[in-house]
């Protein structure tokens, strides 16, 4: 999957921009505040329906404009398609794929798989299990068509179950919901575990490239005792759930554990090593997607020179090239990226005050 044309309108400080990216690495450079990161953000928004920089979508709409508009032509092998999105300041959103209206944002994610490596993405190892569940679920969503519906049902029933607990309902009332909840919870858990097992096979070699002197162990924890049946646990744990007002254990507590020896990776590794570990995780995820469903991710890499030294920049860029994916990289100075590449970028763009110029 790659973008052959990108149109951005009323997004952050970009009034209007047209890009024709290359299939390989696209270098976007400019001063801080020029709008180069906004291009990455716009691509992400087109694939996810939201920003990776702000939870408030209204903030990305330029000045007093009523809406932002994003459009792209996509290519995957011999197949070509079009995707368009308009987000209004009111919160409404319109999405079209090949001219047909799309109701679910999950269809965007399925159509345009995106991986992000930004200064903020390193929080994967620090912000608690939620971000790591999202990491797992990205892969589970793309690898197994059953996952999304099961995940939606888990969230729906969990919300209902927690409300019953807050209302002080007897277990007989909650048990009615538990039968369905258990079925979906176990399916979500099985798909997650299968995905992490597959990821691990690729990850070992990639971590070895980035951190050859470090033995990192990656494991999946499902959110409750592996030796206990979930149905039994929900029943025996009812008094505790009732006291707390929410379901203490379950797939909503799943996690991806990364350890070095007996220590969590975030305690055993330096900040620089942790950055490399996150890069390895993202690279492995993209490679596994290609392996499982023959679809390439699009990589968005923001402010790479400030995050990695020259040696590791070169290593990351080579690993990205090996995926065969389309890559968008930002930098203040182009030399910081160009000097780390074996071959020149497919395309170079300069951004200044929201205006984008292609560099021939």
UniProtKB/Swiss-Prot annotation:
GO cellular component, one term: cytoplasm
Subcellular location: Cytoplasm
Superkingdom of origin organism: Bacteria
Gene Ontology BP term (one): SOS response
Keywords for this protein: ATP-binding, Cytoplasm, DNA damage, DNA repair, DNA replication, DNA-binding, Nucleotide-binding, SOS response
PROSITE patterns noted in UniProt: RECF_1 (PS00617), RECF_2 (PS00618)
Pfam families, alphabetized: SMC_N (PF02463)
InterPro entries: DNA-binding_RecF, DNA-binding_RecF_CS, P-loop_NTPase, RecF/RecN/SMC_N, RecF_2
Binding-site list for ATP: 30-37
A molecular-function term among this protein's GO annotations: single-stranded DNA binding
Classification via NCBIfam families: recf
Task of the protein: The RecF protein is involved in DNA metabolism; it is required for DNA replication and normal SOS inducibility. RecF binds preferentially to single-stranded, linear DNA. It also seems to bind ATP.
Family: Belongs to the RecF family.
Protein name: DNA replication and repair protein RecF
Origin species: Shewanella pealeana (strain ATCC 700345 / ANG-SQ1)
């Amino acid at each position: 999957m790659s973008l052959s044309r990108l149109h951005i309108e009323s997004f952050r400080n970009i009034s209007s921009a047209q890009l024709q990216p290359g299939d390989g690495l696209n270098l976007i450079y400019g001063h801080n505040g020029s709008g180069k990161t906004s291009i990455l953000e716009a691509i992400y928004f087109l694939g996810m329906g939201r920003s990776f920089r702000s939870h408030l979508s209204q903030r990305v709409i330029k000045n007093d404009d009523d809406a932002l508009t994003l459009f792209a032509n996509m290519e995957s092998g011999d197949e070509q398609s079009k995707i368009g999105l308009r987000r209004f300041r009111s919160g409404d959103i319109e999405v079209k794929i090949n001219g047909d209206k799309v109701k679910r944002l999950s269809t965007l994610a399925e159509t345009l798989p995106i991986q992000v490596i930004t200064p903020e993405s390193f929080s994967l190892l620090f912000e608690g299990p939620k971000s790591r569940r999202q990491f797992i679920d990205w892969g589970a969503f793309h690898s197994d068509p059953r996952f999304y519906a099961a995940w939606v049902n888990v969230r729906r029933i969990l919300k209902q179950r927690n409300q019953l607990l807050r209302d002080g309902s007897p277990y007989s009332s909650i048990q009615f919901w538990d039968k369905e909840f258990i079925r979906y919870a176990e399916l979500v858990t099985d798909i997650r575990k299968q995905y992490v097992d597959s990821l691990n096979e690729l990850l070992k070699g990639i971590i070895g490239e980035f951190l050859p002197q470090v033995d990192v162990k990656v494991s999946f924890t499902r959110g409750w005792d592996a030796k206990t049946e979930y149905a039994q646990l929900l029943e025996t744990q009812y008094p505790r759930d009732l006291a707390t007002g929410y379901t203490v254990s379950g797939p909503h507590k799943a996690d991806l554990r990364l350890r070095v020896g007996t220590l969590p990776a975030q305690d055993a590794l330096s900040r620089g090593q942790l950055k490399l570990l996150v890069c390895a995780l993202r690279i492995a995820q993209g490679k596994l997607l290609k392996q499982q469903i023959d679809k390439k991710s699009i990589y968005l890499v923001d402010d790479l020179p400030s995050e990695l030294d020259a040696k590791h920049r070169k290593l990351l860029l080579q690993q990205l090239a090996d995926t065969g994916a389309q890559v968008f990289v930002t930098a203040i100075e182009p030399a910081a990226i160009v000097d780390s590449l074996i071959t020149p970028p497919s395309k170079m763009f300069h951004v200044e005050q929201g205006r984008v110029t292609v560099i021939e």
